[in-house]
């Protein structure tokens, strides 16, 4: 009988395929925004990661299997962080994110092949993932003065996901140079219970966040004139009402300008 963990990996594999397709379709239909493509590629990399774990018995070398898995894991998070930086116009150069990933790969390679150390080999790439996820969490929440509910949820889920990975990494590191069977069991419990739930939750909130972006764009479109980018009657009324409510609290005069542009458009 297959291990219960195998069924979790199969579920994550197909979930990642679906999420990658969803974000690719989002990229196609939302003006080919680069961040949507980055999200699609991120989940595609996750698909490769789960496939790598499912078919690890096909590898002739366990070290090769491990290096591929670690590299794809970091690539997935790098692409996701890159996508969030593009969405929020955060001035973090992609080379910085790639550099963090490459540095993690080099350290993992060193402690896998050159100076074998099980604890460091199993934990270093996870610490890199934690760093990138924390960057993403901050980038999302700092994007606006007043964050939308979807952004708060997405930022929180990235933070929770990072904390779950941090716990798993710390358990792996505490083994030291040699394997500790009890710690490996604890690591597996965290890795296959908390992590999948946090991963799916994070994915759903990213979709919710993009849906919220689209809703705001549609709201703006409904309140502005497409030819002049000025507020239409509905937009003027809504914006003016909000401004008047704000200015009522301040001892100063307000001036509102309203004009009819129908003849101009004709």
Task: Please tell me what each predicted stretch does.
Residues 1-17:
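Hydrophobic transmembrane alpha-helical segments in integral membrane proteins
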Residues 193, 200-203, 214, 221, ...:
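Amphipathic coiled-coil signal-transmission "stalk" helices
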Residues 17-36, 47-182, 189, 199, ...:
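Juxtamembrane segments at transmembrane-helix boundaries
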Residues 219-238, 259-265:
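Conserved nucleotide-binding and Mg2+-coordinating catalytic segments in signaling enzymes
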Residues 239-266:
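Active-site-proximal structural segments of metal-dependent nucleotidyl cyclase/transferase enzymes
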Residues 207-209, 213-220, 242, 246:
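Charged, elongated alpha-helical coiled-coil/linker "stalk" segments that transmit conformational signals
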């Amino acid at each position: 009988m297959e291990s219960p963990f195998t069924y979790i990996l199969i579920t994550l594999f197909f979930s990642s395929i679906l999420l990658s397709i969803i974000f690719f379709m989002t990229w196609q239909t939302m003006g080919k925004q680069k961040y949507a493509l980055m999200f699609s590629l991120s989940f595609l990399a996750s698909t490769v990661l789960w496939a790598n774990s499912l078919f690890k018995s096909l590898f002739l070398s366990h070290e090769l299997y491990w290096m591929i898995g670690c590299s794809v894991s970091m690539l997935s998070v790098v692409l996701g962080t890159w996508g969030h930086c593009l969405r929020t116009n955060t001035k973090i150069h992609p080379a910085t994110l790639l550099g963090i990933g490459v540095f993690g790969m080099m350290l993992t390679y060193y402690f896998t092949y050159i100076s074998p150390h099980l604890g460091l080999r199993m934990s270093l790439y996870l610490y890199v993932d934690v760093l990138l996820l924390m960057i993403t969490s901050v980038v999302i929440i700092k994007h606006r003065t007043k964050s939308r509910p979807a952004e708060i949820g997405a930022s929180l889920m990235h933070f929770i996901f990072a904390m779950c990975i941090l716990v798993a990494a710390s358990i792996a590191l505490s083994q030291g140079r040699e394997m500790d069977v009890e710690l490996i069991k604890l690591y597996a419990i965290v890795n296959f219970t908390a992590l999948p739930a946090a991963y799916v939750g994070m994915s759903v909130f990213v979709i919710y966040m993009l849906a919220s972006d689209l809703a705001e764009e549609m709201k703006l479109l409904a309140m502005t004139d497409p030819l002049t980018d000025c507020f239409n009657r509905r937009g003027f009324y809504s914006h003016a009402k909000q401004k008047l409510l704000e200015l009522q609290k301040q001892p100063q005069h307000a001036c509102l300008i309203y004009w009819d542009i129908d003849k101009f458009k004709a």
